[in-house]
Curated annotation (Swiss-Prot):
Family: Belongs to the bacterial ribosomal protein bL9 family.
Organism of provenance: Staphylococcus aureus (strain NCTC 8325 / PS 47)
Function, as annotated: Binds to the 23S rRNA.
Annotated protein name in UniProt: Large ribosomal subunit protein bL9
Listed InterPro entries: Ribosomal_bL9, Ribosomal_bL9/RNase_H1_N, Ribosomal_bL9_bac/chp, Ribosomal_bL9_C, Ribosomal_bL9_C_sf, Ribosomal_bL9_N, Ribosomal_bL9_N_sf
Biological-process GO terms, alphabetical: translation
Molecular function GO terms recorded: rRNA binding; structural constituent of ribosome
PROSITE patterns (alphabetical): RIBOSOMAL_L9
Superkingdom in the source lineage: Bacteria
Entry keywords, A to Z: Ribonucleoprotein, Ribosomal protein, RNA-binding, rRNA-binding
Cellular component annotations (GO), alphabetically ordered: cytosolic large ribosomal subunit
Length: 150
């Protein structure tokens, strides 16, 4: 019997969500269909599956387009962060990704999660720094941060 998996199943007749697979009739009736792990692969259900896949692909494409637009916006702006300094322009502590995210939100009304910024040690000196940002699995951008004396 041909079934469409509605969720991931591990074990004898394993399959991933959305996968169409031929399984024994008893296994399908007594386990997969009974526990709602799968539905029978009727022409209507197959068509519905195709529509779901198409919709998911369009949503993913839209996410990528949004990330590319945000990358373009970030490349044209500069974030100014002020920090306390000592002699010779050395900062007391460092400028963290949290401070950069807050400044970006306050100055340009752009919200980016601090965990998406790749700045393991923070910024330790005055001046300009380019901070890489992972906007999407496929799209990376850069935030230009200007650290000034407070």
């Amino acid at each position: 019997m041909k079934v469409i998996f509605t969720q991931d199943v591990k074990g004898k007749g394993k399959g991933k969500k959305g996968e169409v697979k031929e399984v024994p009739v008893g296994y399908a009736n007594n386990f997969l269909l009974k526990k709602n792990y799968a539905v029978e692969a009727t022409p209507g259900n197959l068509k519905q599956l195709e529509l779901q896949k198409k919709r998911a692909k369009q949503e993913r494409q839209q996410e990528i387009e949004d990330a590319k637009a945000l990358k373009e916006t970030l490349s044209n702006i500069e974030v100014e962060v002020s920090a306390k300094t000592g002699e010779g322009g050395k900062l007391f502590g460092s400028v963290s990704t949290k401070q950069i995210a807050e400044a970006l939100k306050a100055q340009h009304d752009i919200k980016i999660d601090k965990r998406k910024m790749d700045l393991p040690n923070g910024i330790h000196s005055l001046g300009y720094t380019n901070v890489p940002v992972k906007l999407d699995k496929e799209v990376e951008g850069t935030i230009r941060v200007h650290t000034v004396e407070q």
